[in-house]
Amino acid sequence: MAEVDTFLFTSESVNEGHPDKLCDQISDAVLDACLAEDPESKVACETCTKTNMVMVFGEITTKANVDYEKIVRDTCRGIGFVSNDVGLDAEHCKVLVNIEQQSPDIAQGVHGHFTKRPEEIGAGDQGHMFGYATDETPELMPLSHVLATKLGARLTEVRKNGACAWLRPDGKTQVTVEYQNDNGAMVPLRVHTVLISTQHDETVTNDEIAADLKEHVIKPVIPEQYLDEKTIFHLNPSGRFVIGGPHGDAGLTGRKIIIDTYGGWGAHGGGAFSGKDPTKVDRSGAYIARQAAKSIVANGLARRCIVQVSYAIGVPEPLSVFVDTYGTGKIPDREILRIVTENFDFRPGMIIINLDLMRGGNGRYLKTAAYGHFGREDPDFTWEVVKPLKWEEPSA
């Protein structure tokens, strides 16, 4: 029997105590607070952090009464940053706030100072965004990304529920999957390598770390069928990771954009999501592109798909929409593109209405800021709802 031609592909994730992810979560917690009181809020909120300090800065125009310092401390505390030992002390760290209003030049160009109807609202900036979907997992997401993300989420779960009391908030995961290319569709065969680097306290040995990670983190997350005697495990390979969080590394909003999306699969236009209200097409454009790509795969039009959309500042209609099914389409890509443009309204104001993106509160955007924006079962993730698409398979 001929040997199957395979390749290796790797995706990484970081969990909620990673300094960059801490910043994403603070930025989105600020966005939630603004939208909860004033759905028309215009938010571009950046966060940076280093030892004993968090700074929130950017442009925010809102009628909401927002206590930025409280949001910073609450978010840090919720993640588990409760002492300098673990990397940051939520109660006593310095919190700096430097927030200004949105530029009036941008405001008049995008929403005419709130005089425009939703379908007339222009894109908040230029740029291009991508959505991706693949039939290799029930979530219609790449397996390498799904496993890396779930390992990170599980690390946090066993830290917070006490199963692995030696864990500290910061941590990273990485999964290498061996794939077969089936005429453009991706078929995962096995997990080749699992890498976990997690912050830990002084009391635990490296052997205990490895044993606990295998038992409490890897076993519950990675399906048995993907693990074999050849699977390689790198568990805290550096040997020591006691200092972590903002004490170990500086953090910044928007530095984990591949972890937020598809783990290196598909493509990325470069625009981050967190801290941005939905008039920013970096966020809303990527969300509608995911819904379009996911709907194409879920409706059986293709096994794998990427959608690109692009915008000019102040212009409602997208400049371009592109669809590529990597040769897996049941009908030609140009037909699928026609179905997409007939079924999805890519104008920013209409994306906001159709995906209900102005609804804040309930930690809606905070939830997106760790463990990925896509492939998650949660009614707040409205862009994950599959749209039924009418199409006919060509007769043979």
From Swiss-Prot:
UniProt record, GO biological process: one-carbon metabolic process; S-adenosylmethionine biosynthetic process
Residues that hold K(+) according to the record: E46
Cofactor binding note of this UniProt entry: Binds 2 divalent ions per subunit. The metal ions interact primarily with the substrate. Can utilize magnesium, manganese or cobalt (in vitro). Binds 1 potassium ion per subunit. The potassium ion interacts primarily with the substrate.
Top-level taxon in the UniProt lineage: Eukaryota
Presence of the UniProt keyword Magnesium in the record: yes
MF term (GO), any: metal ion binding
Keywords carried by this UniProt record: ATP-binding, Cobalt, Cytoplasm, Magnesium, Metal-binding, Nucleotide-binding, One-carbon metabolism, Potassium, Transferase
Cofactor: Mn(2+); Mg(2+); Co(2+); K(+)
Binding site for L-methionine: E59, Q102, D249, K280
Family: Belongs to the AdoMet synthase family.
Known role: Catalyzes the formation of S-adenosylmethionine from methionine and ATP. The reaction comprises two steps that are both catalyzed by the same enzyme: formation of S-adenosylmethionine (AdoMet) and triphosphate, and subsequent hydrolysis of the triphosphate.
Protein name: S-adenosylmethionine synthase 3
Source organism of the structure: Oryza sativa subsp. japonica
